[in-house]
Curated annotation (Swiss-Prot):
ZnF C4-type: positions: 51-66
GO biological process, one term: DNA recombination
Organism listed in the record: Parasynechococcus marenigrum (strain WH8102)
Gene: recR
UniProt protein name: Recombination protein RecR
Stored PROSITE patterns: TOPRIM
Domain Toprim: 74-168
UniProt-recorded Gene Ontology molecular function terms: DNA binding; zinc ion binding
HAMAP family: RecR
Lineage: Bacteria, Bacillati, Cyanobacteriota, Cyanophyceae, Synechococcales
Free-text function comment from the UniProt entry: May play a role in DNA repair. It seems to be involved in an RecBC-independent recombinational process of DNA repair. It may act with RecF and RecO.
The UniProt record lists the keyword Ubl conjugation: no
Source taxon at top rank: Bacteria
Keywords assigned by UniProt, alphabetized: DNA damage, DNA recombination, DNA repair, Metal-binding, Zinc, Zinc-finger
Pfam families in UniProt: RecR_C, RecR_HhH, RecR_ZnF, Toprim_4
Length: 192
């Protein structure tokens, strides 16, 4: 049981208590259900790869978003990973295409632009009729570094913008940190 708990703890966002709950839940399931769970994990690992265009997760050479003729071709939203893409898709606001970098520039961790999907992004911009690139990267040192690098690299080809950052809905101003408040002020928009 300790091995199972340890494996669950390795998953992002899973602490010791949640790992223990998951392990106990699985151990109380019928063997066939556990086998189906294990088969689904193995199948996902072997059958899911990356879209050859945007690098989002896909079981096919091209993901559903890249294949969708209803999406706006001239608009690319750059994200760090597929989790960010899925979060944006949940809003149902963005109707363009995506490009998944596969991480963020982090010199401290030895991750430079050459380890990310930057070269294919530049190639897409040169080959496709791109009218704007939107950077939707985490508001962190790494996200800011990556955004600055990409903005300098891509501005000669097309306009580059970055999503606004600010206060989450329902939050109290007094609990927000200075950087968040500063960004919220900088990203303000006039009321219609």
């Amino acid at each position: 049981m300790a091995r199972l708990i340890d494996q669950f703890e390795r998953l992002p966002g899973i602490g010791p208590r949640t790992a223990q709950r998951l392990a106990l839940h699985l151990l109380n399931q019928p063997e066939e259900q556990i086998r189906q769970f294990a088969d689904a994990l193995l199948a996902a690992r072997t059958q899911v790869g990356q879209c050859q265009t945007c690098f989002h997760l896909s079981a096919d050479p091209e993901c559903e978003i890249c294949r969708n003729p209803e999406r706006r071709n001239g608009l690319i939203c750059v994200v760090a990973d597929s989790r960010d893409l899925l979060a944006l898709e949940r809003t149902r606001e963005f109707q363009g295409r995506y490009h998944v970098l596969g991480g963020l520039i982090s010199p401290m961790d030895g991750i430079g632009p050459e380890l990310l999907h930057v070269t294919p992004l530049v190639a897409r911009i040169n080959q496709e009729d791109i009218t704007e690139v939107i950077l939707a990267l985490t508001p962190s040192v790494e996200g800011d570094t990556t955004s600055l690098y990409l903005a300098r690299l891509l501005k000669p080809f097309c306009p580059v913008s970055r999503i606004a950052y600010g206060l989450p809905m329902g939050s109290e101003l007094e609990y927000a940190d200075e950087v968040t408040l500063s960004r919220a002020l900088e990203g303000r928009r006039p009321l219609d």
